Amino acid sequence: MKPSDARHIPVLGPEAVGLLAPRAGGIYVDGTFGAGGYTRLILETAGSRVIAIDRDPSAIAGGADLVTEAGGRLTLVQDRFSNLADVCAAQGAATVDGVVMDIGVSSMQLDQAERGFSFRFDGPLDMRMGRDGPSAADVVARASETDLANIIYIFGEERYSRHVARAIVAARSETPITTTKALADIVAKVVRAKPGEIHPATRTFQGLRIFVNEELDELHQALDAAERVLKPSGRLAVVSFHSLEDRIVKTFLAERSKTGGGSRHLPEVAQAAPSFTLLSKRPIVAGDAEVAANPRARSAKLRGAERTESPAHAAGDLPGWPTLASVMRAGR
């Protein structure tokens, strides 16, 4: 492949692709294509094929040149990565050799004011990765005060969530909250940040974004799907950027790699054989040089595992947190 003039360097890219260990003739899934950084590294490492998925139509359109460069080895599909098993089947790949995922919002999305992901720019309060379904403005306009507080607390880990929700409800009774600046200003009045701390609206924006895009449910389902499509010795590499995501990945891999070891004083309970073997006990984190070049890498954690020959475990139940459908239905 020809090198591109403008290359996107993904966080922990070489490390993630190193865990995948791509081989010639292998089929790999990039569940979160974004700007194509992981996909490009896989294509350059070996004569392999990549099926890349992204729910954002802008990402798919932006990958057209890379599709041409790849000469038939890259297929781009606009879809949610929770559907990766169906996507692979539609591409004639019942099983694959590796899956990589980079969880959360991309730098590209954060830098586009019109997407409404960041309070750094004033733009429409949107936050949708796929451009469909309710926007953040819709949630802010229609969710009850209790639901708003729960969303901001659970998904944003904001301890002042009730104060923020109360302020949002009071403000929207006066005028619709439709821009990122309007929401950030409302939050800043009730969440006081000390010098050197993150912007007071950071956690509220995170909570709304995760909720609007159903990111944690998507992650749960994507991990289950990856387990089903990976062939024996196939590898999974997941990069996460905050504790909510990493906790889900860590728990999933711990459960799937568990090898029994129950108490000898208790009755033996049937337990599914491990479907994964961990590639490292601790997450891989970015080095000082990468963090200096890309501050977003500071919070990144990479976890990897190799598929065993054992059958996939039954998909777990989703946690009982607020759902987009239920909140919007109640807010009518």
Curated annotation (Swiss-Prot):
Cell compartment(s), UniProt: Cytoplasm
Residues that, per the record, bind S-adenosyl-L-methionine: G36, G37, Y38, D54, F81, D102, Q109
EC number annotated for this UniProt entry: 2.1.1.199
Main location: cytoplasm
InterPro entries xrefs: RsmH (IPR002903), SAM-dep_MeTrfase_MraW_recog (IPR023397), SAM-dependent_MTases_sf (IPR029063)
Pfam families: Methyltransf_5
GO-annotated biological processes: rRNA base methylation
Superkingdom field: Bacteria
Keyword list, A-Z: Cytoplasm, Methyltransferase, rRNA processing, S-adenosyl-L-methionine, Transferase
Gene3D superfamilies from the UniProt entry: Putative methyltransferase TM0872, insert domain, Vaccinia Virus protein VP39
Reactions listed under catalytic activity: cytidine(1402) in 16S rRNA + S-adenosyl-L-methionine = N(4)-methylcytidine(1402) in 16S rRNA + S-adenosyl-L-homocysteine + H(+)
TM annotation in the entry: none
GO cellular component: cytoplasm
Region ranges (Disordered): 295-322
Function (record text): Specifically methylates the N4 position of cytidine in position 1402 (C1402) of 16S rRNA.
Classification via PANTHER family: 12S RRNA N4-METHYLCYTIDINE METHYLTRANSFERASE (PTHR11265:SF0), S-ADENOSYL-METHYLTRANSFERASE MRAW (PTHR11265)
Family: Belongs to the methyltransferase superfamily. RsmH family.
Protein name from the UniProt record: Ribosomal RNA small subunit methyltransferase H
Organism lineage string: Bacteria, Pseudomonadati, Pseudomonadota, Alphaproteobacteria, Hyphomicrobiales
Gene: rsmH
